[in-house]
Amino acid sequence: MGVPAVRLIRFVTVAALTVLAMFACVGAAPAANAALQNKLDGSLAALWTSVLETPSAQNSFGTGGAEFNCWYLGRTVAPFDPTAVDSCTVRPGTGIFVVGHSFECSTFEGNGTTDAELRTCARNGDPTTPPTISVDGSPVPVTEAETPLLEITLPADNIFGLPAGTEGLSVAHGWVALLHPLTPGTHTIVITTGTSTVTTKIIVASP
């Protein structure tokens, strides 16, 4: 899913998101433990499933715009948009799923018909150099993540303009961080990919 605003197929998204409190719940980039890796892969899968199965009018990748670019995944929020997320306001205790970069491929977009084809497509969308993420000026470890083969059923008014109930497959790859909740106040997230830099504000409401 590509990022260009209206067309969001096979796109590279540099979405601004994240959270960091006193301690990051993510380890060094290449070597996340199995439990953490499963959680990161699962969070990326949940995020992309939400994007693909949410109607366009309520979708930041569709016609919904910035009003819908803070995605709620249980007790975690993921700022995620085809271009950039200016800010997300969250409750105290909310974790933030940070996507430094993600590329999605699906059968809806004609990117392939098998797990292997879609996975290769998603991996080919990687930037030459992994992104970096910082929170309030401090670097955050970034981990590579990849979804399992996702089985998607499109809603009415979906972002692809296909008939409601259309079924298909999707795989996404990305570089992410899952961090503990931030303290109340305003925090600055900076994601840098190559020469591109995106800044997002995370506003944690007072208890």
Question: Which ranges hold each PLM region?
Answer:
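C-terminal region of N-terminal signal peptides and the immediate post-cleavage residues
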Residues: 23-37
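Bacterial N-terminal signal peptides that target proteins for export
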Residues: 3-15
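Short, solvent-exposed, Trp/other aromatic-anchored flexible loops in extracytoplasmic proteins
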Residues: 169-183
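Solvent-exposed, flexible loop/coil segments flanking beta-strands in beta-rich domains
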Residues: 39-97, 102-103, 206-207
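A glycine-anchored, Pro-Gly-centered beta-turn/N-cap motif
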Residues: 94, 183-186, 190
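Extracellular-facing segments of soluble proteins and assemblies that are Gly/Ser/Thr-biased and enriched
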Residues: 74-164
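Bacterial N-terminal signal peptides
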Residues: 14-24
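Edge beta-strands of extracellular beta-sandwich domains
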Residues: 198-203
